[in-house]
Amino acid sequence: MTRDIEQFRAHVRQWCAEHVPPDWRAAQTGVSDDEYVRFQKSWFAELHTSGFAVPHWPAEWGGGMSVAEQIVLYSELAAHDAPRLVLAFVGIHHAASTLLAAGTEEQRRRHLPAILDGEIWVQGFSEPEAGSDLAALRTTARRDGADFVVNGQKVWASGGLHADWCLLLARTDPDAKKRHGISYLLMDMNSPGIEVRPIKQATGESHFCEVFLNDVRVPAANLVGPENKGWQVAQETLGAERGMTMLELAERLGNAGFRWLVAECARAGVLAESLVADRLAQFEIEITGLRGLCRDLVEGRSDGPADASVVKLFYSELLQRLTDFGAQISGLAGHTVLAKPISSGWESGAWVLDFIGSWEWTIPGGASEIQRTIIGERGLGLPREPAGA
């Protein structure tokens, strides 16, 4: 590792010591939606002012960090228990990667600066009958002059209650094969005809929403990529969930998540018990392995056709086991915690709520069963599952 990287690490550590709110977890427990949005936007602005909000973007748009610098940044933010950018996530990762890869210059100039100013995005992909089989989506976009007229329903839209814009997949050619008649649109969430309904989760939160679209007019200028080629464009969006974003999550799990678990075992007075010590050691080994897989992926040492699926499966299953163990250790007391810091992700130390929430990670972005199929077919060369299996 070079001296420059070590200097950068020292700079990030100093910044974290000065800027990460020391009491943010307590302050973010049980807050209202408005308070949550204000805090998320304020923290994003703090990171942006210091050049830490979008390190993966090109330099001309406010990023330009090397892979090594990004690894250091995410590692130090996790080590200092910084809040997660939950509401900004889709914008800075999914929307940005799509616009940079397939958007027009006008679309980039309109939306990338707005994202840096706090514009919130939601992903409008999944539908009630099109989750794992996303290409089966039924939402339609009919061309009408200079607009597309959109009708349909989206579900599991993360952050939809607060979103300004939506990355929308809709069927523009009903006669084409499933993946060949889909277009990719940028939809203003303030457009007439949009209804957003929160989905109440078992944790008590409403992070996900249903979005109903009734004759919503989307300007044709908001089409990303060629008409009917949205499936190919969407691969850029889905690809943004891998690599560096998974490294950030792995670092957070290895810092805040594991630290909270050790502290829980200490509070329960079981830290010295051999069974508990063995489980903690196993978790630490797995977290170390996950970090290594993520770093191999982002540094280009791993480029197999199923490597991203391996990382996603490994992380989500490990998160679920770790939070399950935390819930067991916390006992009855863990079931009485009814609120958690909502800017923390799924490693808050509210173990029962974290465990319930962890199940979401084994479904979105490709369920664990889908990831295993990809690993088997693309990674190991096993026979493909028969159609309809």
Regions found by a protein language model. Name each.
Residues 147, 151-197:
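A short core secondary-structure module
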Residues 3, 194-291, 361:
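Glycine-rich beta->alpha junctions and the first turn(s) of the following alpha-helix
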Residues 41-118, 159-165, 287, 294, ...:
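Internal helix-loop-helix
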Residues 1-89, 110, 114, 259, ...:
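Amphipathic, small/basic residue-rich leader segments at the start of a protein or domain
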Residues 139-142:
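A structural signal for short hydrophobic beta-strand segments in well-ordered beta-sheet cores
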Residues 117-125, 169:
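A short, Trp-centered hydrophobic/proline-enriched beta-strand micro-motif
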Residues 68, 72-73, 94, 231-241, ...:
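Glycine-rich phosphate/cofactor-binding loops in nucleotide/flavin-utilizing enzymes
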Residues 130, 155-160, 202-203, 360-367:
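Glycine-rich phosphate/pyrophosphate-binding beta-alpha loops
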